[in-house]
Amino acid sequence: MNGVINVYKPQNITSFDVVRIIKKISRIKKVGHTGTLDPMATGVLPICLGGSTKIVDFIMNEHKEYRAKLKLGLITDTYDREGKVLKEEDASKILEEEVVNCINSFKGEIIQIPPMYSAIKIKGERLYNLARKGIEVEREGRKINIYNIEVLKVNLPYVEFKVNCSKGTYIRSLCYDIGNKLGMGATMWELERTKTGNFSIENSINLEDINEENIQEFIIPAEKALSKYERIEIDEYFSRLLKNGVKVKDKRLLDKIKANDILRVYQEDKFIGLGQKTKEGFKIVKLLV
């Protein structure tokens, strides 16, 4: 059993709970998720099985799309509604136009400080473990990209918005930063991941609908999961070299390929893996046979 299942994660379970459930149903040891969703969050969580766990990082690096709701005037220690309330104030007098302009200003490349309640490690310890002990440490800002952000509804103190962003973006931190910029704080109230790369809600499967009898129906082959990468067909000679880890410098192959592009590599219609052209030649970066 190899491939990817586009699971819709329900509320109140962890991403690892989803992995554990799929492991039990599939009876496969190698199962991995492609990007943590907080327990309170719902949405798209692609799960890789068997040999396809090798492509976890490629899916994890894809752009993400979320639909979120924040509450203005509220600050919690976790930056979401499940945390301890640190501050609360009236947000009813702020102008809707001011809120919309503020949220729109986050579009582009920004530096984001991750929340204390996160799985990031500092000196070998998870931040959430330190936070639970009441310890707050300085976190280094990380460069992220907000490709698009759109306000969907304003019903103060609540604001709903849609965001398309890069890997590593914390929507809880984004909500906190929006509130901070407005001078009154904000907390994430709801979160749904609507897309991870090519995986969307429209083609996701509810976790509770997957069982031992039907799981095979929902498995997407690795090559289809990686369909964003262009395809290249190679002959048996180059295939043998690449499978053995050789960096091919032959111009007959190199002239067809742009530098640094990642490609799906096929030989006689059989998917071999992902390849990339570098200064040293063309090589397989992820062998999948």
Swiss-Prot record:
Task: Please give the catalytic activity noted in the UniProt record.
Answer: uridine(55) in tRNA = pseudouridine(55) in tRNA
One Pfam short name: TruB_C_2
Q: What class of enzyme is it?
A: isomerase
- List, in alphabetical order, the GO biological process terms annotated in this UniProt record: mRNA pseudouridine synthesis; tRNA pseudouridine synthesis
Catalytic machinery residues: 38 (nucleophile)
Got any disulfides in this one, which pairs?
A: none
Top-level taxon of origin: Bacteria
Q: Does the keyword Transcription apply?
A: no
Q: Which UniProt keywords apply?
A: Isomerase, tRNA processing
Q: What is its EC number?
A: 5.4.99.25
* GO molecular function terms attached to this record: RNA binding; tRNA pseudouridine(55) synthase activity
- What family does this chain come from, according to its entry? Belongs to the pseudouridine synthase TruB family. Type 1 subfamily.
* The protein's role, per its UniProt record: Responsible for synthesis of pseudouridine from uracil-55 in the psi GC loop of transfer RNAs.
Protein name per Swiss-Prot or TrEMBL: tRNA pseudouridine synthase B
- Source organism per entry reads Clostridium tetani (strain Massachusetts / E88)
